[in-house]
Amino acid sequence: FFVFLFIGVFSLNSAQASFVPEVRPGPGVTAQKWLSDYHPPLKGTNFDTPIFFLDGAKNGATALLIGGTHPREIGPYTAAVVAIENAAVKEGRLIVIPALNASGYGISDLSTKIPRVHEIKGRSGARSLYYGDRRIALADWGKPDDKKFIHMSGFEIDDPEEARNINRNYPGRADGSWAEQVTFAVMELI
């Protein structure tokens, strides 16, 4: 886990590196995978992100907690990190993705002047909470935005930037845009 934390700190200092959330997995974490384990084309990109599994001693229902779909909404990211570090599942399984839109954490929110990094002190020591843009970074997207966003269902939104909004792209496509590939991977996980 120490290597994982080092990579997370390093990623903020390198424009080319992917964002990896600063997480200190608690004793309830039974496994860790990556989103690319469910859709291999994401491996090595700024769209790959860690997934944590917390399994109970007894079989039961499975719950999925996703944080960081919109990196400028700090609450879900914080809730996901708190769950990974503190939850203990007795029955069933909890799957946690703390920072689904890893690309969005790599850039400042384009509509506010809120700092990207918020330093806090807690019981486990000093750490950082991150804040980014709600959309995939244009540099990661790899092309200019189209004139409008057209969902795979045919629904149209006049704001072209919505194509880079992960939440608008479910259920995703294996061969679609980056946002569609991220949501496809989540659906494969489910």
Where in the sequence are the language-model features?
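Sec-dependent N-terminal signal peptides
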Residues: 2-8
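Short N-terminal binding/cap micro-motifs at the start of the first secondary-structure element
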Residues: 60, 72-75
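Alpha/beta-hydrolase fold active-site loops
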Residues: 61-64, 94
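Histidine-centered catalytic micro-motifs
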Residues: 64-72
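Active-site/substrate-binding loop(s) of hydrolase catalytic cores
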Residues: 74-79, 90-190
